[in-house]
Regions:
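Domain-edge interaction signal
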Residues: 2-173
Length: 173
């Protein structure tokens, strides 16, 4: 089991590359969707907001929207330095969200993440990251690894509950 955990921390998830202008446009549209539909008014100065945005973008990939960011597993779950760079440099414009909504399963994504805490997003996104890195893990093995990774920060019962909720929302775990 320990060797698998080591692999997880060394693994870097590679996404399809996208030109920077298109990626920034999509990120702006995604932020607008989050603001209009989830009341998520991104504040760059809020650590919780930055963590939430990192997890929203990562989780959206499981619902069909890949914005082209590379992720590694960090203390708060999957983290993309490229995404951080983009949101620090983002000039929010009034982008059309209709086309973006059509590119992925927005309604299921919205149901899955609406009203969720930073803790919920962190644990569920970490589970997705571990599964993506180790697709052959059974759910029990995945849960065991998740508890080892997040067990110092969160209660085992909460981790199990969030893991099962994520499965019920259609996360590919």
């Amino acid at each position: 089991m320990k060797t698998r955990i080591k692999k997880i921390y060394k693994h870097k998830v590679i996404h399809n590359s996208m030109d920077n202008k298109g990626r920034l446009s999509d990120l702006s549209s995604f932020l607008k969707l989050l603001k209009e539909n989830l009341n998520f008014d991104f504040n760059i100065n809020s650590l919780d907001d930055r963590i939430k945005l990192q997890k929203y973008v990562f989780i959206a990939k499981s619902f069909g929207l890949d914005l082209g960011y590379n992720y590694s597993l960090y203390i708060y779950g999957p983290y993309s330095p490229g995404l951080a760079k983009d949101y620090y440099n983002l000039n929010l414009k009034d982008y059309n969200t209709t086309q973006l909504e059509k590119r992925f399963n927005w309604s299921n994504f919205k149901l899955a993440v609406q009203g969720k805490s930073v803790k919920w997003l962190e644990i569920s996104a970490t589970a997705l990251s571990v599964k993506e890195t180790n697709p052959d893990l059974s759910r029990d093995e995945l849960l065991d690894i998740l508890i080892k990774i997040k067990g110092e920060a969160y209660d085992k019962k909460d981790i199990k509950e969030i893991f099962n909720e994520a499965i019920n929302y259609g996360f590919p775990l």
